[in-house]
Amino acid sequence: MSLFVAVENIEKSFPLSGGNEYLALKGIDLEIKQGEFISLIGHSGCGKSTLLNLIAGLELPTDGAVSLEGQQITAPGPDRMVVFQNYSLFPWLTVRENIALAVDEVLRDLPKEERQAIVEEHIQLVGLGHAADKPPAQLSGGMKQRVAIARGLATRPKLLLLDEPFGALDALTRGNLQEKLMQICEENHVTAVMVTHDVDEAVLLSDRIVMLTNGPGSKIGGILEVDIPRPRKRMDVVHHPSYYSLRSEIIYFLNQQKRVKKLNARKVTTVARHGLEKVNLEIGYVPLMACAPLVVAQEKAFFAKHGLDEVSLVRETSWRGIVDGLTENYLDAAQMPAGMPVWMSVGGQGGSPLPIVSSLTMSRNGNGITLSKALYDEGIQTVDDFRNLLRSTADKQHIMGIVHPASMHNLLLRYWLAANQIDPDRDVQLRTIPPAQMVADLKDGTIDGYCIGEPWNAWAAQKEIGFTIASDLEIWNGHPGKVLGVREDWANRYPNSHVALVKALLEACQYCEDPANWDELRELLSDRRYLSCPKEYIQFSQSTADDLAVPHHRFAGAGVNRPSRTEHLWMMTQLARWGDVPFPRNWVEILERVCRVGVFSTAARELGLSEVVNYQRSTPVELFDGVPFNAEDPIAYLNSLPIHRDFSVAEIALDQPRPIAAA
């Protein structure tokens, strides 16, 4: 495809009463190739239709330029046809006459017979031969929109522009017209730009989906490539492995924009009380069993006990929401996968590094690797069986789900695969999927398995759609699971609040560890505010003799909660091993700043937990394969691993200034 439409640094303002201006779009850059179908999606008021009008020439930009085939667009033209949500048909003309009016005006140089043939061709193209002589009053809404599409295509435009063309139609008619438009565009290689609010419509029709942020000053927040091959059929699209991940990405973006809008609309002030710099905290979490300490601290008033009497727990659907919440400053703290503090501190999220402090390990264990029942039915019961299957079906794509690159799920799954001579990037494909979606994807057959925290392994086993092929007891018993994370600048600004937060959660961890509290804990976690799942799927166990499918969370005990720099270093090496981040040349400095043992020790000492303060973990990091981790020479350790990507070593500058939310 060659470059066809260029939108270059567009800015568009509209005058307001009183001499003011409203900035609708700012800094829009977009290149469209010939034959592409582009969808523009975003909340109302984000400038989707404004951008479409600029491409159509119905509006002119305040700054920047739009060009078609190298020619700047300065006015409407017949090379660009717009199909609006309203049908815009002349009520006194028939279907044939409405189309002919446009054809006769635009293609006037063609012989009459040829123009008539074009009209008839496009009437048949949209399936309206039986209604060609009817006026609009005798047509349904879907038929009227077909006339509008036929009229737009009949003039042979270079670019078809659609402004929510199916928004006013019922679901059945909308679905039929989407299929028809997709067929027409594919068969005729039409270049199209469409405005839509419909996520499924965007995925079905588009080659790329452009997501616009909220206005004023709306910009492109992201562009998704739709890797679903053409020609497409609706059910093939729904069952394609990329469908749910694309859909989830768009929904996540739209939900984040909605949240940002709400946050911008309210004025948040820092509330200091009880000798603490801030007591009104927003703490993020993802609904997994490992969030139990946060739920207990809230429901059993441990937060309030330690002076944090205005805590709100913010439920996120994915770990990306946690990253965005800390990056954008609308979360004070968060439950995190154990590898995320290091990952963000070295810049894994993109952009400059964001130092994250971890002063508490909230849970250990609680993960598992699940494969589909379909694989079990094929005789896959061990990792050797799985490896043999992969080698015998090398031409087939095998997909495993993970929740985030920095999660222990990803690091443990990759380690387990590589230690069993399975390359996690070449023999399988790892796909990032929100935790709650894993089971649905496994059931639907779009993935072959996943590594995730509970209750999703137990859920799959009890629903008989998957089986646990390996638990964390087998891979690394006692590995860090979830940690408390805060921004370093937040920790420095609110040191007393930070200690109070660790104290409250440390008490909550001890509560969660006590088997006498597990029945109540199951009730709390199953509530719709938290995990929103049947409590029979929420199981706890401290016995390693139990079935491997039973979770073995550890929330407290000797060495459970104290953060370990050696463990963080191991995670740092694994992230570098697979090319997610460079290995930091200044790794000692980064570990000292990420792993704040002093804050943990202060909190534990003030709670009277001297045995926790004085405990020193003596067991080295060693996983199931018996390969010792060389914490003295991590580069040599990385080079000794038989399967790894080419990794780089770089100095990571942590002291670049970043704004923190104003008090």
From Swiss-Prot:
SMART domains recorded: AAA (SM00382)
Residues that coordinate or bind ATP: 42-49
Gene Ontology CC terms, in alphabetical order: plasma membrane
One example GO MF annotation: ATP binding
UniProt keyword list: ATP-binding, Cell inner membrane, Cell membrane, Ion transport, Membrane, Nucleotide-binding, Translocase, Transport
Induction: By carbon dioxide-limited conditions, probably via CmpR.
Subcellular location: Cell inner membrane
Keyword Transmembrane helix on entry: no
EC numbers: 7.6.2.-
Subunit text: The complex is composed of two ATP-binding proteins (CmpC and CmpD), a transmembrane protein (CmpB) and a solute-binding protein (CmpA).
Annotated PANTHER family: BICARBONATE TRANSPORT ATP-BINDING PROTEIN CMPC (PTHR42781:SF8), SPERMIDINE/PUTRESCINE IMPORT ATP-BINDING PROTEIN POTA (PTHR42781)
NCBIfam families (alphabetical): ntrCD
This protein's name: Bicarbonate transport ATP-binding protein CmpC
Lineage: Bacteria, Bacillati, Cyanobacteriota, Cyanophyceae, Synechococcales
Name of the gene this protein is made from: cmpC
